[in-house]
Amino acid sequence: MQLFDLWTDLLDLLTIVAGPTAVGKGTVISHLRKCHPQVKVSISATTREPRDSERDGIDYYFVTDEVFDCMVRSGQMLEWATVHGLHKYGTPKEEVERLLHTGQPVILEIDLQGMRKVRKILPAVRTVILLPPAWDDLICRIKRRGSESQDEIDARLATAKKELEAIGEFDYKIVNADVEIAANELWLAMNRV
């Protein structure tokens, strides 16, 4: 029996949360976890440098290109992609399996490419896209972060447009105009069967 066959029994616990850059995925998920601490979040691996507030093994597994490529070649990734044409991101299978076996709700915070790859393997997985109230809000949020160059901002916004065009691929759409409301809507979506 394959790993994914075992996961189908636990699929109701799994929710993919995606959305464009700077839409507030991490903020909404953090707020949700304050209200519902039993919710687990899979930690992704990435080849990008950590931002000032990020910690290895807590926010991401920060790895070199060589280590990431080795993880992909050895089949350790559930999904992976080069995002914004800049850095690689991926979801380690072992991490997701470990979290699912806790019997608690699990969130995968991944991008559109990752969602599509997971959905090919697990077609019934629940998917949620977080949306900005307006395009200009997204631009303001990414610039306010102050952690990307103009070229990186442009690449992220180009990717964001593509992600927003794919809104119909998601089961649930949540506008993040208010973090508390968005977190509550996410919780409700996670608990629909």
Curated annotation (Swiss-Prot):
Statement: the UniProt record of this protein carries the keyword Cytoplasm: yes
Q: Cite the GO molecular-function annotations of the record.
A: ATP binding; guanylate kinase activity
Q: What are the alphabetically sorted keywords of the record?
A: ATP-binding, Cytoplasm, Kinase, Nucleotide-binding, Transferase
**Cross-referenced InterPro entries:** GK/Ca_channel_bsu (IPR008145), Guanylate_kin-like_dom (IPR008144), Guanylate_kinase (IPR017665), Guanylate_kinase_CS (IPR020590), P-loop_NTPase (IPR027417)
Q: Which cysteines are joined by disulfide bonds?
A: none
> Where does the chain bind ATP?
19-26
Keyword Kinase attached? yes
Query: Which principal EC class is assigned to this enzyme?
Result: transferase
Its cellular-component GO annotations read: cytosol
Gene3D superfamilies in the cross-refs: Guanylate Kinase phosphate binding domain (3.30.63.10), P-loop containing nucleotide triphosphate hydrolases (3.40.50.300)
Q: Where is the Guanylate kinase-like domain?
A: 12-191
UniProt subcellular location: Cytoplasm
- PROSITE patterns attached to this UniProt entry: GUANYLATE_KINASE_1 (PS00856), GUANYLATE_KINASE_2 (PS50052)
Superkingdom of source: Bacteria
Q: What is its EC number?
A: 2.7.4.8
According to UniProt, the reaction catalysed is: GMP + ATP = GDP + ADP
The record, for SUPFAM superfamilies, names: P-loop containing nucleoside triphosphate hydrolases (SSF52540)
Write out the function statement from the record.
Answer: Essential for recycling GMP and indirectly, cGMP.
* Membership in a protein family: Belongs to the guanylate kinase family.
What is this protein called in UniProt? Guanylate kinase
Q: Tell me what gene encodes this.
A: gmk
